[in-house]
C-alpha cells in the first residue's frame, strides 16, 4: 500500500490522474477497492449497480448528471459490463491527483463473459459476450506503462511514474490562449463563435469569463443545468440558465430578447433543429463542444452544422488546464475508445487528372472484419474516425456495436492505401408473418429492425419485416474525397454482395434534404416513407427509401412508392415539404385517387380496431371522409387541422390526447360500418391477432 500512496503523491505533484485495474472474482475486486480507498482521503464515488452500502454511488446510467462537476478519486464497476460512455464521462470529472479504480472480471475469461451493457446496443434480448472490444481494451491497458493491473493471486506492483516537471495549476486567471480568444470575442459585434477542445481544456471556464467582460446581458443554455457547473463558477451571478427548448419557446413567444451573448455549452448534445431555430434571435453566440467523446463529436459537429453557417469563427483549446499534459488516464482512454483522430484523415488526395469521379481501378473496396481489426487496429481507427467525422452523434456506444453486435456489415474504400470511405450496414427482417402482422397493428415492437418495422408500423407495408434486408446505418467519406463517386461505389459493391446473399432489398433512413435524397436516388433507392415529425438529431423530416433486389423487394418498393405518391396530397397538410412525386391534378375529383381500395380498408381497420397511429392512417382517413355523410366532427377537424390536436380536443370537450385518439378510432369504426358493414367486419377479423381472429370465426 506504500506504493499506492507514493504514486498518489506523485500524481498530485505532477498534476495527473492514473488508472488502477482490479481483475478477479467479484468479491475480491470489491474488497481490494475498499481497502485501497481507505488509504487516501477523497470523494471515492462509486459508479456501480451493486456498490457497498457504505459508499457514495450512482448507476452508470446516471453518470451524465455529473458532467460539469469535479471529484477526487472514483471507482468504476465493470464486473458485469463496460458502459464505455459512463467510463469516459467519469474520467472527465476527476481532478488532478486522482486514482480511477476499475473493477473487471478475471483477466483470462473476461472476453468470453456476457456483457450486460450489450443490452443497450445489441438487438439481442439477452446479454452477449463482446470478445473483440474487450480484447482491444485489454491490449490498450497492457500497452500503457502507467496503467496498474492487479490480478487476483498476484502481488500489487505499482511502477513509479517517470520524472516530469511539477504541475502549476491554473490560478483563475485566463491563460495566454484564453486571453487571446476573449480579446477577439469582446471585439466582435455579431456572429457565431465555436470553441472546440477535449475535456479539461478550459472551454467552459472561458465561456464563464466572457460574461464577466461583457457589459450587456448574457444567457446560458446547455443540455442540462448540471453540465454548466464549471461555466457558472466563472460566470456573472446574473447570467441565467435556460433549458434549450424553454429558451426557444420564450423566443418564439416574445421575439428577440435584449441579450448581448448567448452561451451554449456542450452544443453537440443539443438537437440541431433547436440550434438552427435559436440562432436568429441573438446577435452574438458562443458555442462550446468537446472534440471527441460522449456528448457527440465536435469535429463532426463542425463539419455538419457549422459549415452551413454564413458567419462562424472556430477557436480551439489544446492544452489541458484541469490536469497536466500527457495525463495517463486521459491517454489510455483516448487510445482505448479511439478518441484521437488520425492526423491525415482529411488531407486531400492527389489530383486524379481533373476527374470528378475516381477511376474504379484506383478504388479498393473491401469487407472489414472485426477479427482482422485485432491484428490491424489501424483499420478500425480509420473506419471509426471517418464515422465520427461524418456523423456527430457517433459515440463509444457505436464503437461497441461496430465491434461486437451481431449482423453488422462494414465495407471500406481505399485510395492509394488510405481508407477514404466507410459503409456500415445492419441485417434486418426475417420476422414471421404473425409477428410482422402484430408490428403492423401496433401491438408489438421487438428490438431492432428499425426500417423494416417502421415500414410496417408507419408506411402500411405489413409484410416488410418478413423480407430479408440490410439497412444502411452510416456512410462516411473523408471530407477531402467527396464528390468523387466513393459513396456510390460503396453502395454498388454492397448491392452486389446483398444480391449474392439472396436478400430482398437494401434500406436507408435519413433526415430529408433534397441534396441528400438526390444521392440516394442516384444509387437506385426509391422513396417509400416520409415521417410526420422533425428528427431531433437532424432537424429534418425522417425519410426512408429502399433499393429492391428480388421480385418481392421490387413489389414492396413499388407498393411503397405508389402509396406515398397517392397519400402525399393529404400528407402535405402535416408535412410541409416540397416533394417531386407523381400526382394527379384536382385529386379530390379523381375517382381512382379517392376510391377506398383494399389497402385503405386494411389501414382504416388497423386504426379503428387495433393500434395503428393516426399519422400512418391520416391519408386513408381523409379519403374515407369523402365517402361518408356521417358528421364525424373529430375526424373532420383532424383532416382540416391535423397539427392542432390540443385545440381540437378542447373544441370537442375532450381532455387530453388519449381521449381524442379514442374518439377518432370510434368515429372511424362508425364510418366503416356505415359504408359496408360486411367488408368492415372482414377487415376487423384480419386485423385481430391470429388467435383472436380464430376465436371470432369459431366462437
Curated annotation (Swiss-Prot):
Any single GO CC term annotated in Swiss-Prot or TrEMBL for this entry: cytoplasm
Known catalytic reactions: cytidine(34) in elongator tRNA(Met) + acetyl-CoA + ATP + H2O = N(4)-acetylcytidine(34) in elongator tRNA(Met) + ADP + phosphate + CoA + H(+)
UniProt-annotated binding residues for acetyl-CoA: 475-477, 482-488
Compartments where located: Cytoplasm
Binding annotation for ATP: 178, 200-209, 322
The keyword Nucleotide-binding is assigned to this record: yes
Residues covered by the N-acetyltransferase domain: 408-547
InterPro entries: Acyl_CoA_acyltransferase (IPR016181), GNAT_dom (IPR000182), NAT10/TcmA_helicase (IPR007807), P-loop_NTPase (IPR027417), TmcA/NAT10/Kre33 (IPR032672), TmcA_C_sf (IPR038321), TmcA_N (IPR013562), TmcA_tRNA_bind (IPR033442)
Chief location of this protein within or outside the cell: cytoplasm
Keyword flag Cell membrane: no
Single annotated GO MF: ATP binding
GO biological-process terms attached to the record: rRNA acetylation involved in maturation of SSU-rRNA; tRNA acetylation; tRNA wobble cytosine modification
EC numbers: 2.3.1.193
Keyword annotations: Acyltransferase, ATP-binding, Cytoplasm, Nucleotide-binding, RNA-binding, Transferase, tRNA processing, tRNA-binding
Domain of life per record: Bacteria
Reported function: Catalyzes the formation of N(4)-acetylcytidine (ac(4)C) at the wobble position of tRNA(Met), by using acetyl-CoA as an acetyl donor and ATP (or GTP).
Family statement: Belongs to the RNA cytidine acetyltransferase family. TmcA subfamily.
Protein name per UniProt: tRNA(Met) cytidine acetyltransferase TmcA
Species this chain originates from: Pectobacterium atrosepticum (strain SCRI 1043 / ATCC BAA-672) (Erwinia carotovora subsp. atroseptica)
Amino acid at each position: 500500500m506504500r506504493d499506492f500512496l507514493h504514486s498518489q503523491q506523485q500524481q498530485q505533484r505532477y498534476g495527473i490522474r492514473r488508472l488502477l485495474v482490479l481483475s478477479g472474482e467479484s468479491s475480491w475486486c470489491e474488497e481490494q477497492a475498499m481497502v485501497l480507498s481507505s488509504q487516501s482521503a477523497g470523494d471515492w464515488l462509486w459508479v456501480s449497480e451493486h456498490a457497498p452500502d457504505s459508499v457514495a454511488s450512482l448507476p452508470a446510467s446516471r453518470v451524465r448528471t455529473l458532467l460539469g462537476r469535479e471529484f477526487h478519486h472514483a471507482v468504476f464497476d465493470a464486473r458485469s459490463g463496460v458502459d464505455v460512455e459512463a467510463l469516459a464521462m467519469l474520467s472527465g470529472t476527476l481532478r488532478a491527483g486522482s486514482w480511477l479504480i476499475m473493477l473487471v472480471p478475471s483477466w483470462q475469461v473476461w472476453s468470453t463473459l456476457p456483457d450486460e451493457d450489450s443490452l443497450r446496443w445489441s438487438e439481442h434480448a439477452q446479454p452477449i459476450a463482446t470478445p473483440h472490444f474487450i480484447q482491444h481494451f485489454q491490449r490498450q491497458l497492457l500497452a500503457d506503462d502507467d496503467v496498474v493491473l492487479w490480478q487476483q493471486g498476484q502481488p500489487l506492483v505499482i511502477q513509479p511514474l517517470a520524472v516530469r516537471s511539477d504541475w502549476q495549476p491554473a490560478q483563475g486567471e485566463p491563460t495566454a490562449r484564453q486571453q487571446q480568444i476573449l480579446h477577439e470575442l469582446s471585439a466582435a459585434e455579431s456572429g457565431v463563435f465555436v470553441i472546440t477542445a477535449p475535456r479539461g481544456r478550459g472551454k467552459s471556464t472561458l465561456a464563464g469569463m466572457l460574461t464577466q467582460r461583457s457589459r450587456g446581458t448574457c444567457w446560458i443554455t446547455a443540455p442540462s443545468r448540471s453540465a454548466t457547473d464549471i461555466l457558472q463558477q466563472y460566470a456573472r451571478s446574473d447570467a441565467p440558465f435556460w433549458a434549450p427548448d424553454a429558451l426557444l419557446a420564450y423566443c418564439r413567444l416574445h421575439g428577440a430578447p435584449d441579450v448581448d451573448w448567448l452561451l451554449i455549452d456542450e452544443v453537440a448534445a443539443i438537437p440541431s433543429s433547436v440550434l438552427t431555430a435559436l440562432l436568429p434571435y441573438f446577435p452574438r453566440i458562443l458555442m462550446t463542444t468537446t472534440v471527441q467523446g460522449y456528448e457527440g463529436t465536435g469535429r463532426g459537429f463542425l463539419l455538419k452544422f457549422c459549415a452551413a453557417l454564413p458567419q462562424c469563427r472556430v477557436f480551439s483549446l489544446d492544452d489541458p488546464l484541469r490536469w497536466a499534459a500527457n495525463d495517463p488516464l486521459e491517454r489510455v482512454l483516448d487510445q482505448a475508445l479511439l478518441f484521437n483522430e488520425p492526423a491525415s484523415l482529411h488531407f486531400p488526395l492527389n489530383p486524379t487528372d481533373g476527374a470528378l469521379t475516381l477511376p474504379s481501378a484506383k478504388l479498393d473496396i473491401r469487407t472489414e472484419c472485426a477479427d482482422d481489426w485485432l491484428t490491424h487496429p489501424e483499420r478500425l481507427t480509420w473506419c471509426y474516425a471517418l464515422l465520427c467525422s461524418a456523423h456527430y452523434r457517433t459515440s463509444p456506444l457505436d464503437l461497441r456495436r461496430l465491434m461486437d453486435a451481431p449482423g453488422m456489415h462494414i465495407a471500406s474504400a481505399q485510395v492509394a492505401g488510405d481508407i477514404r470511405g466507410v459503409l456500415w450496414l445492419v441485417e434486418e427482417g426475417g420476422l414471421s408473418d404473425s409477428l410482422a402482422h402484430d408490428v403492423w397493428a401496433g401491438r408489438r415492437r421487438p428490438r431492432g429492425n428499425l426500417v423494416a418495422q417502421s415500414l410496417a408500423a408507419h408506411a402500411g407495408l405489413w409484410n416488410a419485416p418478413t423480407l430479408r434486408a440490410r439497412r444502411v446505418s452510416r456512410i462516411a467519406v473523408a471530407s477531402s474525397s467527396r464528390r468523387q463517386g466513393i459513396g456510390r461505389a460503396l453502395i454498388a459493391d454492397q448491392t452486389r454482395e446483398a444480391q449474392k446473399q439472396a436478400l430482398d432489398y437494401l434500406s436507408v433512413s435519413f433526415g430529408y434534404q433534397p441534396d441528400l435524397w438526390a444521392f440516394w436516388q442516384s444509387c437506385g433507392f426509391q422513396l417509400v416513407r416520409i415521417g410526420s415529425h422533425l428528427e431531433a438529431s437532424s432537424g429534418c423530416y425522417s425519410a426512408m427509401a429502399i433499393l429492391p433486389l428480388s421480385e418481392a423487394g421490387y413489389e414492396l418498393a413499388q407498393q411503397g412508392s405508389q402509396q406515398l405518391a397517392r397519400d402525399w396530397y393529404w400528407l402535405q397538410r402535416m408535412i410541409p415539404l416540397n416533394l417531386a412525386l407523381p400526382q394527379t391534378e384536382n385529386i379530390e375529383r379523381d375517382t381512382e385517387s379517392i376510391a377506398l381500395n383494399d389497402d385503405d380498408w386494411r389501414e382504416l381497420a388497423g386504426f379503428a380496431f387495433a393500434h395503428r397511429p393516426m399519422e400512418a392512417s391520416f391519408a386513408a382517413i381523409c379519403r374515407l371522409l369523402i365517402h361518408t355523410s356521417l358528421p364525424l366532427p373529430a375526424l373532420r377537424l383532424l383532416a382540416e387541422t391535423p397539427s392542432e390536436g390540443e385545440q381540437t380536443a378542447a373544441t370537442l370537450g375532450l381532455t387530453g390526447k388519449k381521449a381524442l385518439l379514442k374518439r377518432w378510432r370510434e368515429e372511424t369504426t362508425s364510418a366503416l360500418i356505415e359504408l359496408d358493414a360486411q367488408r368492415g367486419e372482414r377487415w376487423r377479423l384480419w386485423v385481430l391477432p391470429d388467435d383472436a381472429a380464430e376465436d371470432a370465426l369459431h366462437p
